[in-house]
C-alpha cells in the first residue's frame, strides 16, 4: 500500500462498502415471491465489510503461523500520510515484546470482530500453548481467533519506506517513530555513463 494525504483508517484496515448481491424478491409479508417453484431474485445494493491491506496481512499471518511462514506488509511513502489517523488504535500493536508479539493487544469493535470470526472460522493454532505462556497462561489465542482482540504475531513484519528528501506533509511524531527500527538506505551505485539514442541523437544519462 502507498500512503498519501487522503489515506485513512478505513482504506488501510477496512470498512463497509456498497456492493451488489442477488437477493430474493419478497412480498408485503416478507415472503419470497415465486413463479411455480422458482424463487424470484434481483440484484440489490448491500453493504459488506471489505478488508484492506492491514487486515488482509494480519489474517494471513495467523493462518500461516503454524507453517513458520513470514507475512510482510509493505507501506510505501509512509510520511505522505497522517500516520496517527491511519493507524488509529493499531498504534498500540506496534510495541512488540521479546518474542515478537504485540505487548498490548487491543479490543476489536463489533464490526471488526464479525469480520475476524468469519476469516478465522475453523482455524486452529497448534502452537497456542506456547503463545499463551508468553501472556502468563491467558488463553490469548482463543481471544484472537474469536475476534475479541487484535494482536500482531511474530511472523508479521511491517516494513515502510520514506524519502527523507521529500518535504513531509504530515510530521511523524516521536512516539510513533520509536516503535520502528530505522535503517538508512543510500542510493545504490547504479552503472553510470549510459548513452541513450533517440531519433538518431545520443544523450548522456546519469
What positions do the PLM features span?
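C-terminal regulatory/interaction module of P-loop NTP-utilizing enzymes
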Residues: 1-206
Amino acid at each position: 500500500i502507498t500512503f498519501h494525504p487522503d489515506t485513512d483508517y478505513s482504506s488501510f484496515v477496512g470498512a463497509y462498502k456498497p456492493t451488489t448481491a442477488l437477493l430474493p424478491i419478497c412480498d408485503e409479508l416478507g415472503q419470497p415471491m415465486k413463479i411455480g417453484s422458482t424463487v424470484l431474485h434481483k440484484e440489490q445494493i448491500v453493504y459488506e465489510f471489505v478488508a484492506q491491506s492491514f487486515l488482509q496481512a494480519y489474517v494471513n499471518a495467523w493462518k500461516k503461523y503454524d507453517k513458520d511462514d513470514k507475512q510482510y506488509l509493505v507501506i510505501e511513502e509512509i510520511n505522505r500520510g497522517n500516520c496517527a489517523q491511519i493507524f488509529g488504535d493499531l498504534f498500540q500493536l506496534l510495541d512488540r515484546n521479546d518474542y515478537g508479539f504485540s505487548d498490548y493487544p487491543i479490543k476489536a469493535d463489533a464490526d471488526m470482530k464479525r469480520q475476524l470470526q468469519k476469516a478465522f472460522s475453523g482455524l486452529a493454532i497448534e502452537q497456542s500453548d506456547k503463545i499463551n505462556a508468553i501472556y502468563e497462561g491467558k488463553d490469548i489465542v482463543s481471544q484472537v481467533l474469536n475476534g475479541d482482540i487484535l494482536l500482531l504475531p511474530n511472523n508479521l513484519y511491517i516494513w515502510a519506506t520514506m524519502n527523507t528528501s521529500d518535504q513531509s506533509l504530515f510530521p511523524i511524531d516521536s512516539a510513533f517513530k520509536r516503535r520502528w527500527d530505522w535503517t538508512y538506505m543510500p542510493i545504490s551505485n547504479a552503472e553510470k555513463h549510459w548513452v541513450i539514442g533517440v531519433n538518431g541523437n545520443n544523450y548522456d544519462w546519469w
